[in-house]
């Protein structure tokens, strides 16, 4: 396989997706300075990609969501069964068989540029300010240890691992809201100084393949959103597809361009101005604390696991967990959002007219033409009244308007 050194990147002729160059010249020089001179990137088809999973201030919920994915599954990625997608070698401190130095060996090899294959860094959880913990001789989030000059060992913060691995990574992917936006550990008043990966690496960060930080939010995220983003990114890195479309915050555009409300199974109730008054009601949940109309997330259409479940689908309200403002800007939870006072009031006014009109249409459409001619409905399940004089007149006007400008092939009695 031919190779190309990082200090002589090929010219980029056209803009691909949201990345129009590998990085700024100054940033590239800074990244190259962090890498050994012999560091190389493969050109041509990639057969294997290593995925180094790091965990910061997290609850491991993102790991659980990822292994629950089905479209594609983590097993598909590891086995290399997806056409065009290189086989993924996953290094995960919880899922791996190895432990101790045997586990961290490959991380060290990647840091030194001796891995012999491209790699991506996946970070779960927010990054705490380790200086705060170090002031008292501790640490917040660490993995592995390194020898000190005095012979002692010191834990290696995962933030340090990220700083070491990010410059040479083909891509850095933040999974979950803690990693993408800071999340709960970074909420106002936290004592850890936690921040997101994007905040930690900075605006000018670019991976070795020219990509800014990729963000797949959610607390926890939809597992399929994560694995699909991984697969699409690897297809691009392998030269089998264009760069996936990401929005201005690095989110997969095709997954986060619509709101929860636009695909919600309860959205029809909102349109008609009927709202739930208590949890367990079937109507729209906006008035009991749902932020769905202004939250970018696809869980109502994709479900939580295997296209099943999801907050609103199972009766829960949306608390905005995929958004950068979570949790502070959505607090207090389970309270009617301020904007709902206006939007739901408008829906109620419109619904006052829409609901009766739709019932009239349903009454018209719930009759066979034969039943209209014969004047009765032959149902043994209950008595169905014929429309009265006024309703009959409305139905005739409905039919006339329905076929306005069209040829009617049947006669209404």
Q: PLM ranges: what are they?
A:
Residues 312-314, 319-322, 332-413:
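Terminal low-complexity/disordered tails
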Residues 2-301, 307-311, 324-331, 400, ...:
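Iron-sulfur-associated redox domains of electron-transfer enzymes in respiratory
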């Amino acid at each position: 396989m031919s190779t190309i050194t990082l200090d002589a990147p090929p010219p980029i002729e056209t803009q691909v997706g949201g990345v129009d160059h590998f990085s700024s010249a100054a940033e590239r020089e800074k990244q190259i300075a962090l890498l050994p001179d012999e560091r190389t990137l493969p050109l041509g088809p990639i057969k294997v990609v290593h995925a180094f999973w790091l965990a910061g201030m997290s609850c491991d919920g993102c790991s659980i969501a990822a292994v629950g994915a089905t479209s594609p599954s983590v097993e598909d990625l590891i086995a290399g069964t997806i056409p065009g997608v290189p086989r993924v070698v996953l290094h995960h401190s919880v899922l791996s068989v190895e432990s101790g130095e045997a586990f961290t060996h490959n991380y060290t090899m990647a840091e030194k540029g001796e891995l012999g294959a491209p790699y991506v860094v996946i970070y779960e959880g927010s990054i705490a300010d380790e200086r705060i913990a170090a002031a008292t001789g501790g640490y917040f989030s660490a993995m592995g240890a390194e020898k000190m000059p005095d012979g002692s060992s010191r834990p290696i913060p995962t933030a340090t691992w990220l700083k070491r691995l990010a410059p040479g990574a083909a891509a850095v992917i933040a999974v979950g809201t803690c990693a993408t936006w800071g999340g709960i550990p970074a909420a106002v008043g936290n004592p850890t100084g936690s921040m997101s990966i994007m905040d930690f690496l900075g605006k000018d960060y670019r991976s070795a393949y020219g990509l800014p930080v990729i963000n797949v939010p959610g607390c926890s995220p939809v597992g399929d959103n994560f694995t699909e983003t991984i697969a699409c990114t690897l297809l691009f890195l392998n030269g089998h597809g264009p760069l996936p479309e990401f929005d201005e915050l690095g989110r997969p555009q095709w997954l986060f361009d619509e709101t929860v409300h636009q695909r919600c199974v309860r959205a029809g109730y909102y349109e008609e101005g009927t709202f739930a008054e208590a949890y367990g009601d079937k109507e729209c949940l906006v008035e009991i604390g749902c932020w769905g109309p202004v939250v970018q997330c696809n869980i109502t259409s994709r479900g939580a696991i295997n296209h099943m479940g999801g907050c609103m689908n199972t009766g829960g309200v949306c608390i905005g967990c995929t958004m950068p403002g979570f949790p502070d800007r959505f607090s207090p939870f389970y309270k009617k959002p301020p904007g709902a006072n206006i939007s739901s009031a408008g829906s109620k006014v419109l619904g006052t007219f829409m609901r009766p009109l739709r019932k009239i249409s349903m009454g018209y459409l719930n009759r066979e033409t034969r039943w209209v001619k014969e004047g009765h409905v032959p149902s043994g399940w209950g008595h169905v009244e014929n429309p009265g004089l006024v309703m009959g007149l409305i139905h005739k006007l409905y039919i006339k308007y329905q076929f306005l400008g069209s040829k009617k092939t049947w006669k209404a009695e």
